[in-house]
Curated annotation (Swiss-Prot):
It comes from Lachnospira eligens (strain ATCC 27750 / DSM 3376 / VPI C15-48 / C15-B4). InterPro entries: EF-4, EFG_III/V, EFG_V-like, EFTu-like_2, G_TR_CS, LepA_C_sf, LepA_CTD, LepA_IV. Its EC number is 3.6.5.n1. It is an enzyme of class 3 (hydrolase). It is a peripheral membrane protein. Coiled coil: none annotated. It comes from the Bacteria. The keyword Nucleotide-binding applies. This is Elongation factor 4.
Amino acid sequence: MAGINQKNIRNFCIIAHIDHGKSTLADRIIEKTGLLTSREMQEQILDNMDLERERGITIKAQTVRTVYKASDGQEYIFNLIDTPGHVDFNYEVSRALAACDGAILVVDAAQGIEAQTLANVYLALDHDLDVFPVINKIDLPSAEPERVIEEIEDIIGIEAQDAPLISAKNGINIEEVLEQIVTKIPAPSGDASAPLSALIFDSLYDAYKGVIIFVRIKEGTVKKGTKIRMMATGAVEEVVEVGYFGAGRFIPCDELTAGMVGYITASIKNVRDTRVGDTVTDNDRPCEQPLPGYKKVNPMVYCGLYPADGAKYQDLRDALEKLQLNDAALQFEPETSIALGFGFRCGFLGLLHLEIIQERLEREYNLDLVTTAPGVIYKVHKTNGDVIDLTNPSNMPDPSEIDYMEEPMVSAEIMVTTEFVGPIMKLCQERRGIYNGMEYIEQTRALLKYDLPLNEIIYDFFDALKSRSRGYASFDYEMKGYERSKLVKLDILINKEEVDALSFIVFAGNAEERGRKMCEKLKEEIPRQQFEIPIQAAIGSKVIARETVKALRKDVLAKCYGGDISRKKKLLEKQKEGKKRMRQIGNVEIPQKAFMSVLKLDDE
């Protein structure tokens, strides 16, 4: 470890659109530099969460350090960070970029540039990184590397004539990529003797070691025994161990110096002491000012998370705090619901993010959860001039106090092949989209620009986009701001009682249809009882849709055989009377499936 020359360090990450082969290229780099033997290799070695392997996507940015002997005879240390491609995990990418000096842009030779490719490249250029392109999947019969090279130069404007043409899957031309990392990515700068300043770009919780923080050392040196201070929270700790990242494991070392990427443990037990984006400095000899951290990420989608068993409330709080360490974009605050008890209002970056967090809570922390329908943040302008941010429909003021409401809008860019332009434009119109123009990138592909309400895209816009374009469209969006809109709160009443967890805010023009669909869906999910259950959708006091779950009834006439009609009538009347009394005092259990099915309203 000692005596590493800073000139021989390369910190870089791999960026690309979903499924263009980032993680596979990372595998090949690890294999070619001899970090793991071919027996130890497995596909997507850096995707170490079960969830990532099952879905075949990268969720967490993962770091690994490997050594490469270049053609100039010198040994170089590579710190490689594999990043996610999904729009929901953009903040993971920006965190990884802050720890790097350069980036490899992977582009699929058959599909070319897609919306997410552009978004990630611009992120990298914002961080002043040197980006060099690599054309992957050249072994595919449909590969057109020449066309893709032209596209990269025309659309992104970076030199691509000498881009390596590789197949990460078959290991073709990987050597060329390794050589270009050495020549095209700059060595880190920074003075090892200056006061310590290090950027926390990730962290995780270990039951034995406490909080483990991942850092990029910008200036100075840190070793065991150093007293460190977190500049944002002011927490002071003594370093127990420093080290770097092997494949799937931590490797301790003596010290980390300027330019290196590694981890620090300091027996930090309080999860709130470390924040991603904070600067670590030496307590006795601090640096003058903190490093520019990250833009704070604002959640786009909110929903309630409740433990199915109310006694597990504290466990859910602990689990959320530990997940927040590892996932800086997750936000939560306590809330209560009449129907579901105590829980948390959580903020996410998108629906995929919500799903992943929910699955991680259920798997890693053995929790059983109930989720309410996701919604966005609305701005409510009241008649007295106050403006409130509304994340929970239950907190909506009385309609008489509301002057008007605004909803968040996004600017979306949709990249699509020309044959599907029609269906995609129709989809955007159905979702209240405002057309902003279209550019043809080449004869066969177009870039559509739309302003869309965030409310309309958080549910299943992505799925609808993929199905209407047979998987060819790609989509990227960014927040545009708030616009005035006619919104109403839709309440769901079950057995004449309002269920606050099922309420949601909807555009007035779609309210009736949504209400009707919701009632039909709930009718399928709620089990029949001894009495009939009315399910109603209402705006204020006006009921706009109704379905009824029929009662189960005993055949009271079974003993009557022939018998007199008035005797039968008497028995039926008596039964009817009993059912009526039951309905007044009966409680309806709403199964978890009913809450979930409401999220999938538009799938039919």
